[in-house]
Design a protein with these regions (language model features):
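N-terminal secretory signal peptides and thylakoid transit peptides that target proteins
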Residues: 1-18
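N-terminal Rossmann-like FAD-binding beta1-loop-alpha1 element of flavoenzymes
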Residues: 45-71
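Glycine-rich FAD pyrophosphate-binding loop
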Residues: 64-88
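Dinucleotide-binding Rossmann-like beta1-alpha1 core, especially the glycine-rich loop
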Residues: 92-191
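Active-site/ligand-binding neighborhood in enzyme catalytic cores
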Residues: 188-313
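C-terminal segments that line or cap access tunnels to active or ligand-binding sites in enzymes
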Residues: 267-278, 334-336, 341-511, 517-542, ...
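Conserved beta-strand-loop-beta-strand element in the redox core of flavoprotein oxidoreductases
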Residues: 311-331
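Active-site-proximal substrate-binding core of FAD-dependent oxidoreductases
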Residues: 552-594
């Protein structure tokens, strides 16, 4: 198996990165350089944003629009886990390098904050900016193994009048969808739909005090159901989608996500179809235009700089210790600081004095992360797969995937990328790194990079080639690329620079707010408490808006506050939730909860 994913890649770019100057280096209070377009006014308040993922870029965007001078510090590359990247050494004959990524992007219609930002990023020829680069796959598939028939179906999207939302109408609609897609025994389908109704009609207090403490496995009574029920509705929903074990995942988190998709499928409260992806590699469609727009607003970037410590003195953040590309350490100062690093990296930068100033920061140590990382397979022939996402729910490593070239209509894949031999990219997410595979009997972490690639390929074939048709063949495999954020595979100490926040029971109580007790320090990232309650790009975007609003309040600014769009609440169900609040306070079950 030819591999291009075994070498380590360091993402440090930009000729200006090696230059000195943060927002202000200690002893050198340089103002931000002028940028094309409307930059900050002389004497504008200065903000340092730590991290250039979706959270950091969103914060920079909102602040720059409000006249702040923003400098963003990023260790590797703009876009964080959302970015796409080049496969090193893969370009031939004037083509672009093969496109790769940490994991495929998924921007469902339940998102509202991120799409709003996308509409405000100009893109040539698009009236609605980057948002116009979203396309909707037509179908999805649960790919089964061991000869079981795959479950393939269209993605419901009414596109016209929304469905009714009385409990009985919801029951009928969901039962019909589940019976069509999943082929479970009717009594199990009916039971699961009733559990959905329990959650949909539960009051906020019950959700936060009971369902947050209840594992999803227990909530859906998986232990007493068939193996098919467990695989699809317990494990398949949690491990493959939110990278959390069903036996541990918070029902509030899983239920909140499920509720949003139920409303989306029924045509309620959505920005668009339930499944949307970008019509180009992520950097081409989104991150590169975003960078260009932010630079036009005067945002400055320091790429290749590592944040070492957020320092605290005299009741405020006094500066941030950073290390430049040359290894030299300096201190940058500003009026305000937004920490937009992933939680596992951010908490290492919080000094003891800073933690003492706000105990909420210490609770972030209890937040848990796990591995969910991508690998891409480049094919010399397009496989006859589903026209959308597929979920290999029987795969030991919880694989999900999508074949991408058909969704990029403005690109001729072999003419535009690589050496001309690869015609498509099958992008796969690996959500389970701690269970043995089918080839070597080892976990993904115990395998070498080459063994991971072979094992994932074998598991894909086990799910896709088991019903009489060979959809994937070894002869069509051109090469592969494994996310360079993982290192040390096959050694006693594997590492992952891009772990994902997971949601075991009780996670809600340890999520911080965007504003801290330190008046000039704010938090932004998918671990911050926002409405969606899930580690997503939407959560990162919403948290950045909340952080900016908190900063504006602390600054006494008269600038307009960012709109933070909440999750949709169906008006028809509010009466049921009020009734449930009354029952909950009396110590009674939800009216639909029959055990």
């Amino acid at each position: 198996m030819a591999g291009t994913g075994s070498s380590r890649r360091t993402f440090i770019a930009g000729a200006g990165a090696a230059a000195a100057a943060g927002v202000a280096l200690t002893g050198a209070g340089a103002a931000p350089a002028a940028a094309a377009g409307a930059g900050p006014a002389p004497g504008a308040r200065r903000v340092v944003a730590l991290g250039a993922g979706v959270a950091g870029l969103t914060a920079a965007h909102e602040l720059a629009e409000r006249g702040y001078a923003v400098t963003v510090y990023e260790r590797r590359a703009l876009g964080g886990k959302a970015r796409s990247m080049d496969v090193p050494g893969s370009a031939r004959g004037g083509r672009r390098p093969l496109p790769a990524e940490h994991g495929f992007r998924f921007i469902p219609g339940i998102y509202h904050n991120l799409p709003d930002t996308m509409r405000r990023i100009p893109f040539p020829g698009n009236a609605a900016g980057v948002w116009d680069n979203l396309v909707a796959p037509r179908e999805m598939m649960f790919a089964r193994a061991a000869g079981r028939e795959d479950l393939r179906g269209p993605i419901p999207w009414p596109g016209h009048s929304p469905a009714g939302l009385t409990p009985e109408e919801i029951r009928r609609a969901l039962a019909g969808i589940l019976q069509t897609l999943l082929r479970l025994p009717p009594h199990e389908t009916a039971y699961f739909v009733d559990r959905v109704l329990v959650f949909l009609t539960s009051c906020d207090e019950r959700r936060e005090e009971v369902w947050e403490r209840t594992p999803w496995w227990d909530f859906v009574r998986a232990e007493r159901m068939s193996n098919e029920y467990r695989r699809i509705l317990a494990v398949g929903i949690t491990r493959n989608i939110v990278a959390t074990k069903a036996e541990e995942a918070s029902t509030r988190t899983v239920g909140t996500l499920g509720e949003a998709f139920v409303f989306n499928v029924l045509g309620r409260g959505a920005d668009g179809p339930p499944d949307r992806i970008l019509d180009l590699p992520t950097n081409e469609a989104w991150i590169d235009p975003w960078e260009a727009h932010l630079r036009s607003l005067g945002v400055e970037f320091r790429i290749g700089w590592t944040v070492r410590e957020v320092r605290y003195a005299d009741g405020r953040v006094s500066g941030v210790g950073v290390e430049g590309p040359d290894g030299a350490r300096q201190t940058v100062t500003a009026d305000h600081y937004i920490s937009a690093l992933p939680v596992e990296h951010a908490r290492r930068t919080w000094s003891a004095a800073l933690r003492a100033a706000d105990p909420m920061l210490g609770r972030c140590d209890r937040l848990e992360t796990d591995w969910m990382t991508g690998i891409q397979f480049y094919l010399t022939e397009r496989a006859e797969l589903v026209h959308g996402h597929l979920n290999c729910i029987d795969s030991p490593w919880s694989l999900t995937a999508i074949q991408q070239a058909e969704h990029w209509p403005s690109r001729d894949f072999p003419a535009d990328y690589g050496d001309g031999a690869a015609v498509d990219c099958l992008s796969v997410d690996i959500s389970e790194w701690d269970k043995p595979g089918i080839l070597y009997g080892k976990t993904a972490k115990q395998c070498t990079r080459e063994e991971v690639a072979r094992e994932v390929w074998a598991q894909l074939k086990a799910s896709l080639n088991d019903t009489g048709r060979a959809l994937l063949t070894d002869s069509t495999l051109h090469s592969w690329f494994l996310d360079p954020g993982v290192d040390g595979l096959g050694t006693p100490h594997p590492t992952n620079q891009d772990e994902l926040l997971i949601h075991p029971v009780g996670t809600l109580y340890n999520r911080p707010t965007a504003g801290t007790r330190v008046p000039n320090f704010f938090l932004s990232g998918d671990y911050v408490a926002v409405d969606i309650d899930l580690a997503t790009m939407e959560g990162a975007n919403a948290s950045a808006r909340a952080a900016v609003n908190s900063l504006l309040d602390r600054d006494g600014s008269d600038a307009a506050r960012c709109t933070v769009h909440p999750m949709y609440r169906a008006p028809e169900l509010e009466a049921a939730k009020r009734h449930d609040r009354w029952r909950y306070r009396l110590g009674l079950r939800n009216v639909f909860d029959l055990g």
